[in-house]
Amino acid sequence: MKNVLIIFGKPYCSICENVSDAVEELKSEYDILHVDILSFFLKDGDSSMLGDVKRGTLIGNFAAHLSNYIVSIFKYNPQTKQMAFVDINKSLDFTKTDKSLVNLEILKSEIEKANYGVWPPVTE
């Protein structure tokens, strides 16, 4: 069973789309799940299944810790049911306007280094 990369992006965001396209190159190593963050957090979105308290906590955590990320990536281990935050910002080159803005070697390294169960995320 492969680990899962969960990509939280925004609709109509070219950087999010380019990151998603680049990460697709890792699909032989990971299952990849793309999540539209706005739809996810809508009142009737998928986050509503968490219940009001957990949903509110999740929204608060996103706002507090991930608001400076255009796109967020987590890795998920389906066997242990643990998640880890992946610091994608280290792999991005914003001078590029296509999927080459993601340095896949750096991203792979960040995915491997991401520690399960660490929250809030430790960023350098």
Swiss-Prot record:
Keywords: Disulfide bond, Electron transport, Host cytoplasm, Redox-active center, Transport
Localization in the cell: Host cytoplasm
A GO CC term assigned to this protein in UniProt: host cell cytoplasm
Record bears the keyword Electron transport: yes
Entry's induction text: Expressed in the intermediate phase of the viral replicative cycle.
Disulfide bonds: 13-16
Domain of life: Viruses
Family: Belongs to the glutaredoxin family.
Biological role: Glutaredoxin necessary for virion morphogenesis and virus replication. Functions as a thiol-disulfide transfer protein between membrane-associated OPG128 and substrates OPG095 or OPG053. The complete pathway for formation of disulfide bonds in intracellular virion membrane proteins sequentially involves oxidation of OPG072, OPG128 and OPG088. Exhibit thioltransferase and dehydroascorbate reductase activities in vitro.
Subunit details: Homodimer.
Name listed for the protein in its UniProt record: Glutaredoxin-2
Taxonomic lineage from the root: Viruses, Varidnaviria, Bamfordvirae, Nucleocytoviricota, Pokkesviricetes
